[in-house]
């Protein structure tokens, strides 16, 4: 069964699915836990689908096309059914490589008559956590007035090139009162 994490105050304003990822779930599960807490604190219900454990990109990058396609189809079908039955406002990825793959589902299945529409919908619903926070939530971020830091930020290649996300992560950091420094040649 799916795991549903409800807002603590019971005042749900949105419902999203979270991709927990095959690698992240094992190596850094605290990132998923923090994502769920953050969304819940801002009245967002989070659902984690039990049958979705990998976006499929690892097999895709290793050239294991059939295995990758099985993951893609399973994910698309599962999220699309959840979208139709219970509603989803977004599918959240907090790993840029996975997010890029999910956003590519529509392109990957553009010539597949059976999967085309569903894959396109899943791609449209997919948001990086920084996109979702910026576009959907009015975050009241407490500024650090005591000590300001200079924070060097380097966007992952899959974030800046694959998903075309440039400003949201830096804007979120800036809202804390700290200065964001771009790394020379960070676009490479």
Regions found by a protein language model. Give the residues of each.
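Iron-sulfur cluster-binding electron-transfer modules in prokaryotic oxidoreductases
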Residues: 1-188
